A protein has these predicted regions:
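Membrane-interface micro-motifs in multi-pass membrane enzymes
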Residues: 118-142
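Residue-level detector of alpha-helical segments with a strong bias toward transmembrane helices
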Residues: 74, 111, 135-138, 142-145
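Polar helix-capping/helix-linker motif
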Residues: 8, 46-48, 152-157
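N-terminal membrane topogenic signal
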Residues: 3-16
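N-terminal TM1-TM2 helical hairpin plus the immediately adjacent luminal interfacial "cap"
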Residues: 16-123
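Internal alpha-helical transmembrane segments of multi-pass membrane proteins
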Residues: 90, 125, 129, 153-156
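Alpha-helical transmembrane bundle and helix-membrane interface signal
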Residues: 80-87, 139-157
Length: 157
């Protein structure tokens, strides 16, 4: 398969881009939905667990959205070069990173609350997942394409 052709798994990237763009249109351009309902705010997660996933769909502004869409295109190119044979790898990676992001922020919040520090912040955007994908690509280039952290990932050698 040529690198400039569309593969069967490209729908994963198109769906991601479509959702990011759609949420931006509905929250920022049309204003139908208040994007503050999507922010990842650690103290609200127990009552509103949907924020674990919706926060990655929300972006601060058009530049933030465009930089994340550019990151999706770049990581798609390199993942395609690696020759991923696993189905739904990209979507599984996104979901895994969302849970990992939630866990890290939750632990951070618990550590700070132990010292009676309660920061007021919200996390938004797809940037963390893009950075995780770049880190994954960097590690697979160093350590090989067949196994990652002891698990078979089935990239061509």
């Amino acid at each position: 398969m040529a690198l400039n052709s569309i593969s069967k798994s490209d729908w994963q990237y198109l769906v991601t881009g479509f959702f990011l763009t759609s949420v931006f249109i509905f929250t920022d351009l049309i204003g139908v939905i208040n994007k503050e309902y999507f922010y990842f705010v650690p103290r609200l997660i127990s009552d509103q667990p949907h924020r674990i996933f919706t926060s990655i769909l929300t972006h601060a502004d058009l530049n933030h959205l465009l930089s994340n869409l550019g990151g999706i295109i770049i990581t798609r190119y390199f993942l395609m070069r690696l020759g991923n044979k696993k189905r739904f790898f990209y979507l599984k990676f996104i979901l895994s990173c969302s849970f990992l992001n939630f866990f890290i922020i939750w632990v951070y919040e618990k550590i700070l609350s132990y010292f009676n520090i309660y920061p007021n912040y919200a996390a938004i955007g797809f940037s963390g997942i893009i950075y995780a994908l770049f880190g994954f690509l960097l590690l697979t280039s160093f350590y090989g394409k067949k196994y990652f952290l002891g698990k078979e990932i089935s990239f061509k050698s």
